[in-house]
Amino acid sequence: MTRVPGPVEALERIAYLLERGRAESYKVRAFRRAAYAVAALEPEQLRALHKSGRLTQIPAVGETTAKIISEALSGETPGYLLELERRGGPALSETASELRSALQGDCHSHSDWSDGGSPVRVMAEAAASLGHAYLALTDHSPRLTVANGLDAERLRRQLELVDQLNAELAPFRILTGIEVDILEDGTLDQEEHLLSRLDVVVASVHSKLRMESPEMTRRMVRAIENPHTDILGHCTGRIIVGRGRKPSTFDPEKVFAACTRTGTAVEINSRPERRDPPLELLRLAVGAGCYVSIDTDAHAPGQLEWLGLGCEQAAEAGVDPVKVVNAWDADRLLAWTASHGS
């Protein structure tokens, strides 16, 4: 940072950088709670507590966050913040860097309406600060109860909120959306009339991931052929960190042929623990002529910076930038989502 941040800004920036670095959520929450508590104080109150050495008397402020606040109030950039800034993100190849620069938005993100950690406004403002022109808000559908999926009524209320925020945040745009579960029979887990109102529909498999390949193939193809489906999310469902999770098995030639036939995009899910689809499958999708959407699946503001990871995977697979739907401006993207299934 070229200027010294105030205590609230420093705490919020640390939380953001911890999110980017995949820190445990409790660590992130500690800094965000401290930032909220400090923001609620009058400047004179905060200075008095600092001068008397009583910063830890502020609710949600412990020894670590008190040190951050003290350094910021003393006119210093907190040492922990400098350390996190120096870590930075992964270096990108030239091709991946060029692709990252071409992206205009992100078509897969979550808020605290489902299993994300931040309000819609905070996610949108973080996306705008990264230079995005738009962010698709794609909270989960009702069947995924573990992720607090939105039933029809909650989704309607969220649409109203997005309308309000778009009026305030213009020209930045929050695109209405959903990450809708692909049910066992290939149908989508939300009411048809609501799906038709959304800007972006990401369809993903979250259950019965160990289905036999023929059944999984039929399930996925049926979902892809649904005219509401715009993007096929994290198609194998694999997890490549920790205990991991093996990828689902399906016939990629049939699945990607269905995507090409319907104009549905294959998502490159940039989450470090997913990096889905694997490179060999992504190359098959490229060979089939599929559109691609490079998304973060962000559940917190700092995770919106993960797009570069997906761009690196796209570069390795030889993805043609003209096929990347979130390299388009919002109007072109919405024209595509409105027409590609017809």
What is each PLM-predicted segment?
Residues 177-180, 309:
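Active-site catalytic microenvironments in core metabolic enzymes, especially phosphate/sugar-handling
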Residues 107-113, 134-138:
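Ser/Thr-glycine-rich phosphate-binding loops at phosphate-binding pockets of nucleotides
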Residues 2-3, 78-102, 120-125, 131, ...:
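Charged catalytic cores and adjacent phosphate/nucleic-acid-binding surfaces used
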Residues 117:
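Positively charged, glycine-rich low-complexity segments
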